[in-house]
Amino acid sequence: MTTQFSVAGVELELLRYPAQQESNLQAWDAADEHLLKSLIESEQAAVPTAIINDSFGALSCGVSKLNPSWPLCVETDARTSFLGTEQNHGRNQLPLDNLQWFTSRDTLPENLALVLMKLPKNLSYFAHQLTRLSQVLPAGTRILVAAKAKSINGALLDVFGNHLGPASASLAWKNTRVITCVSDGKPRPLAKEVTWAVPEYQLEISNLSNVFAANKLDIGARIMLENLPKGDFKSIVDLGCGNGVLGLRTAQLFPEADIHFIDDSEMAVASAKANWARNQLPADKGHFYWDDCMTHLPEEVQPDLVLCNPPFHQGEAITDHIAWQMFLDARRRLKDGGILHIVGNRHLAYHVKLQRLFKNCTTVASNGKFVILQAQKK
């Protein structure tokens, strides 16, 4: 893995967050390079700029390297992106006082004169981001969006036109392109919230746009709900909670328990919190954390059950480091005798990791694609 970023005279040292990861993953990609290269070649003045979907700070560090006083609004939905960007600014002796931080639900300032953006995997989320920009950007504002060349087509350019303004793509460089969109100055309304029922559990669920499983139970959650553990649980963590459906169901089954919802996505945590209220569950029993696994979970929280459906993607990268960290955090934070109860794709072989960490692992249920595993802290 290289940590040395070099584009058009800008030299940086950049690491992913957390830093202890596979050696084949780096903290930026060619789309970051292309976008920063385009900015430098345009000799852009240091105007108020939004940087959106900057994975670990390559863009904000690069722009700050060009001009440490360049006013930047950095928007991210991922806690790991926020933490990684902070660390990489420190690693390169770059100030943070030129940065304002925003989540994907915050209202952006109206003085923006430029937007630099990476194309996210989730196009519904992307449409939401463009719509939010349409509500604050004056006509004529440029939005530069970098992506893999294979991701750019006529349908994507139509998304720009429908939600923000006309767009065109650059020539390819390192298999990436930069789309230039010009705001038409017409504010669009945000999409209406979609709520859907899970009748077998008497639950009503809604998701914000960057939350997995838009309008139905995903298969992994369904098999998990069918195989929740039995016991006398008082403190439960829904780790990587998404819309919170697992934690909501455990609140029904164990009404005396405190349920702690944790996710790297701010939209996921907000969705879980809204769903808790929507289903009229006790306000004092639900606790919500936008966090990198259990890194900042209060020390007094000692769960006797952790539920987990680990992701194996971080942005565009396929990686098992998130699952490893979730399992390690569970082992560290569980009470003696506490249970880690997970669902995963069979091919990911999580049983090997759990056996290594906990010295025990039981297969609770399985089908052709998924397996439910349980390990106990002893």
Curated annotation (Swiss-Prot):
Keywords on record: Cytoplasm, Methyltransferase, rRNA processing, S-adenosyl-L-methionine, Transferase
Gene Ontology MF terms in the entry: 23S rRNA (guanine(1835)-N(2))-methyltransferase activity; nucleic acid binding
KW Cytoplasm (keyword) present: yes
Source superkingdom: Bacteria
Main location: cytoplasm
Documented EC number(s): 2.1.1.174
Keyword Cytoplasm: yes
GO cellular component terms, A-Z: cytoplasm
CDD domains in alphabetical order: AdoMet_MTases
One Pfam family hit: MTS
Disulfide bonds: none
Described purpose of this protein according to its UniProt entry: Specifically methylates the guanine in position 1835 (m2G1835) of 23S rRNA.
Protein name, UniProt field: Ribosomal RNA large subunit methyltransferase G
Gene that this sequence comes from: rlmG
